[in-house]
């Protein structure tokens, strides 16, 4: 599409998003926003697509932009709250994964250190082989 009409790009973004074609929807919303950076619904809908892709931080930025343009735009406030909740949960999940993996990594580090120490004592610093 070579349209210079922001509403055409916005409509295309909506159609692509409805069809589940998130990447093309993002491209269309970006084109709409290039042509009209104050298109509140385009910012909001771009945020929705990013949310679906679990790109919560980017979605929050889009909702913030929509709210900056129109502080009374309730959809953006609602969507931002959901994105922030899910972003927070993803951080909690990552922290739990890190906490689970930390002891494994510490044990591996200790084992590698012990091996390195034994090789050093035998004088085989580079290859780790017995001399």
Language model: regions and residue ranges:
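Alpha-helical segment of the N-proximal tetratricopeptide repeat
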Residues: 4-35
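Conserved alpha-helical positions within TPR/SEL1-like repeat arrays
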Residues: 7-18, 41-52, 75-89
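Canonical positions in the second alpha-helix
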Residues: 32, 65-66, 116, 123
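Short coil/turn linking the two alpha-helices of tandem helical-hairpin repeats
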Residues: 88-96
């Amino acid at each position: 599409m070579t349209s210079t009409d922001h509403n055409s790009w916005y409509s295309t973004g909506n159609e692509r998003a409805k069809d589940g074609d998130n990447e093309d929807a993002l491209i269309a919303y970006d084109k709409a926003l290039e042509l009209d950076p104050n298109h509140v619904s385009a910012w909001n809908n771009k945020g929705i697509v990013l949310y679906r892709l679990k790109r919560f931080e980017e979605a929050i930025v889009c909702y913030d932009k929509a709210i900056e343009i129109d502080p009374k735009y309730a959809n953006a406030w609602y969507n931002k709250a959901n994105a922030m909740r899910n972003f927070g949960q993803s951080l909690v999940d990552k922290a739990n994964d890190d906490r689970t993996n930390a002891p494994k990594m510490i044990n591996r580090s200790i084992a590698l250190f012990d091996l390195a120490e034994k090789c050093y004592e035998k004088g085989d610093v580079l290859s780790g082989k017995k001399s």
